[in-house]
């Protein structure tokens, strides 16, 4: 990093120029962010106000205020003084929308309370619908807008990698992205920027550019070859470490001379002893070192080996992305390439000395014949990545300023994802000229100048129109919105070419591009990011498994559990299947390890594939996924309320209200919990007046899943630890929903969701994907768009790929 020599008396010092340059960009950003978002129109028309006072309010007082009034506010909603100005009071608008929802669903008034007549229900629903529609129309020019959206960590990582072509952990120093209320990490309302964060972006840009843009002669190349004669292992010199079972490792050590930066190539020659009934071995290559008390390696790649023939594989990475030793320190100095067989069937290791290098002939092994290491790998000098930015030109040696301008004119449009103006380019050229005397070489000065590009709002934000009236986004904005939706990264050359020609906004071309993006492997980013955030899959890793209950649990299963749910989404998306498979399905996606966990036979290897499920497995759909069941458990047992809330929130977009303050948990409320079934505990909890109403609406959804334990295994008995042993009781999985529907077990719950709640699920999924696609929360102004998309979705038999295409072609996606 360059250390500037600053002087407060020097108005043209490099840091002064830097501050001036960045201030211009961030001031513009601030002005955009402060565009007025208020409207002089009132949300409630005079006639509407009269109707409310004369017809609506009396019904509320007679049927609703006892539970939603001054003395009691169930679900934290009070109706006797709820504002009727839905435009100016967003919270009131959302509460009225919730009232409309429960009225239409027949959930209110609840059983046991005086019911509304048909005419009374019509008065309420008509008034609320009209008030919401008027508020939407009055605020249409501003509602549903998120002018500024910063790239989140994933988007920044992918964008920097694609822009520079360099493998690096760009997001290493960035703070975590906070999820928005709807659970998404690409929501512009939650993605803020601090001064410290901007410093991290600058440091990251400098670090990356120092690796891409080089100067001076080519560095020396290090080449090593390792054979069976100089194999290392975990504990000392033994030839058995060349045959890799579950515990052995081939360690190729470079003690004295080794590179500390640059691209590397590792070539591994090996054979495999396959055991098809046990699954395939996994060849893992990692690079790092071994200090005295730690093992510090970072994985390069893992490959599933499906052939016993001798073969050679090559692996690539960058040295500086891996842990590096301090020269001359530690018991095991030097850089190490580690080769392992990561296969593990989760069976217990042999006892005693045999567990060091266990002889397990029934398991697959890998035999290493040789390992070659070379770094830095560079076919040309300067490297290709350097030449992509600082390209050959006669201007390079004749007119440095003109050459810099040409470089910026090529680099900035790719970074900003749009055409740039001469003014924008010349501002950076001026910056370069100002700082040039401070740097020994042109390359050094260009690194600093390009770093300024990479911390501009035009790069870090998805900037879209700030006009007071909504308008259709232009072709460049559409290209970015589409690529960040489906790839979580910048548009590629073809997408930008269609934007430049204007063809992208033609419906047939746009549809072709959506299909192309979905068929590209980069769409895995959409599958992974959306599925994780929609289903809250990240919670899986935060659940601590209670080893008293599950002593043999393999932590690698957590990754498999998450991948099952991601792979199911990917399978449904790729083949344009019905999204109702999320609710109930006759198949799932499994690898060998997760199949063994479920007790499903004849599934081998690490690769996930579609597996048909017999009905007695109860696994079909998300509610049979261990990811969902574990993330909504305690790590020792199921958690009925968490599972129920997850169903209501994630599948139906109907989250129950948060519990009132000072309400005890189940365990606190029931001191004799071990002697009670979960249903009995909940019934006792409902005996508390403050808890009864909410739990009547929540608990049944989770009780139906009680046949699944904490880690997603089927059970007929529930075990609880008592002293040094366990006590058991039969599973009770029968419950009655608020509408009187009785459910016994997960199969009846899934059938009910498909037959009676598929419309609610469809609307919920449309809302989630639309919100994710535009990077903002869904608001009342989106109500009409969601209704239209849901109708299309239903008419298309809930086909997921069609839904994505319809969203991209919708007015909501293409306007701002």
Regions found by a protein language model. Name each.
Residues 1-23:
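N-terminal secretory signal peptides that target proteins for export/translocation
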Residues 24-38:
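Bacterial N-terminal signal peptides
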Residues 41-223, 338-394, 408, 413-430, ...:
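Aromatic- and Gly/Pro-enriched helix-to-coil junctions and flexible linker segments
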Residues 44-98, 105, 112-118, 361, ...:
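Sequence context surrounding c-type heme c attachment/ligation sites in exported
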Residues 52, 56, 91-95, 100, ...:
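Secondary-structure capping and boundary motifs in well-ordered enzyme cores
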Residues 109-110, 133-137, 168-171, 182-183, ...:
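Secretory-pathway/luminal and periplasmic proteins that interact with or process carbohydrate-rich
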Residues 127, 155, 159, 163-164, ...:
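Extended surface/linker regions that mediate inter-domain or inter-protein docking
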Residues 408, 412, 424-428, 446, ...:
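Extended, hydrophobic alpha-helical segments in both membrane/secreted and soluble proteins
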